């Protein structure tokens, strides 16, 4: 589990934002509480965490969104365990819904490059507790922009739709809102009959040595939702890579299967390739491949058990990685 930035009093800011909505429409408080472990080379790291999210509507056209994370990390050392604390405000943005086809976003937002950053980073959504090895490509070091964004559905029919997102971010060295000067966007076609989404992304770093990033994604699921495929490929100036992930609910519609229908076998394959080692971009320094095998269990009432085994290979050798976790997702109106 990688954390892009730290903010010592980020959660207080999150709560102060949340508290301003008393006189407004009912805000929603969502998020998760989790306890996860990672074992590598016989050493186990323990991480309890909470990841709250607030959505605060302000009338018919405005909304404020924010997500934070707080965790404690216990890392083994020669004498026992080191302990560290981490808290961060992942994003804090205001949305103006101008038309059914256009939403204007301002503030600190997750970069819409690819799909993983926006869709799968919440711990209650991702099947695996860590992101893909290639995910840092195109994320401008922090995965967060500070500035403006436009997004929406440009066209929609019974057979196809096209959605878009475009951003411009300023450079900021602020501890809570760390970002790089960049611009880019993403476009996606969705075919509801086939349950297929395909799209492409482009990003450009506009500070220091200017760099270009490109990406493409494909998501698909069967009609009953029992099998899902998610995949991305991305390329930057110094590295490129891909990942694809599948999950399967074998007894999705069979109530007679009892507790067995709640098991969810998973598989993820990922590779990264170095073009050079000029930049420190968060991608492994050597060509790396990794296979992840997982088995999740979905309890009633929004509780999941995550478990996975991974084998990672590179020129420096191979390593086994075991990960487990339990995640509870909560969602309720803050007040009425």
Positions of PLM-derived features:
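Bacterial N-terminal signal peptides
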Residues: 9-18
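Detector for outer-membrane/organellar transmembrane beta-barrel domains
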Residues: 27, 32, 61-62, 188-280, ...
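Solvent-exposed loop/turn segments connecting transmembrane beta-strands
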Residues: 39-46, 71-86, 140-145, 172-181, ...
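Outer-membrane beta-barrel "beta-signal"
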Residues: 150, 319-336
């Amino acid at each position: 589990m990688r954390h892009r930035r730290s903010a010592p009093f980020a959660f207080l800011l999150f709560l102060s934002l949340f508290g301003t909505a008393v006189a407004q429409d009912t805000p929603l408080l969502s998020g998760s509480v989790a306890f996860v472990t990672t074992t590598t080379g016989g050493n186990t790291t323990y991480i309890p965490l909470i990841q709250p999210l607030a959505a605060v509507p302000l009338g018919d056209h405005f909304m404020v969104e924010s997500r934070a994370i707080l965790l404690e990390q216990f890392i083994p050392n020669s004498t026992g365990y080191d302990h560290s604390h981490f808290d961060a405000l992942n994003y804090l943005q205001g949305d103006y819904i101008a038309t059914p086809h256009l939403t204007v976003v301002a503030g600190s937002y997750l970069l819409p490059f690819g799909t993983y950053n926006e869709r799968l980073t919440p711990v209650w959504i991702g099947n695996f507790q860590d992101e893909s090895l290639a995910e840092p490509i195109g994320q401008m070091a922090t995965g967060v922009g500070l500035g403006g964004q436009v997004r929406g559905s440009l066209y929609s029919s019974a057979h196809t739709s096209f959605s878009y997102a475009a951003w411009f971010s300023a450079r900021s060295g602020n501890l809570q809102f760390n970002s790089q000067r960049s611009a880019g966007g993403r476009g996606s076609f969705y075919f509801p009959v086939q349950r297929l989404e395909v799209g492409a992304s482009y990003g450009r770093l506009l500070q220091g040595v200017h760099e270009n990033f490109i990406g493409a994604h494909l998501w698909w699921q069967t009609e009953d939702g029992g099998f899902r495929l998610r995949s991305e490929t991305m390329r930057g100036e110094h590295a490129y890579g891909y990942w694809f992930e599948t999950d399967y609910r074998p007894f999705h519609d069979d109530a007679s299967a009892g507790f067995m229908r709640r098991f969810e076998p998973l598989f993820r394959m990922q590779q990264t390739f170095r073009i050079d080692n000029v930049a420190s971009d968060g991608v492994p320094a050597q060509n790396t491949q990794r296979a992840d095998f997982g088995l999740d269990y979905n309890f009633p009432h929004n509780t999941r058990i995550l478990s996975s085994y991974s084998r990672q290979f590179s020129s420096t050798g191979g390593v086994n990685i075991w990960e487990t976790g339990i995640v509870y997702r909560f969602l309720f109106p803050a007040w009425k």
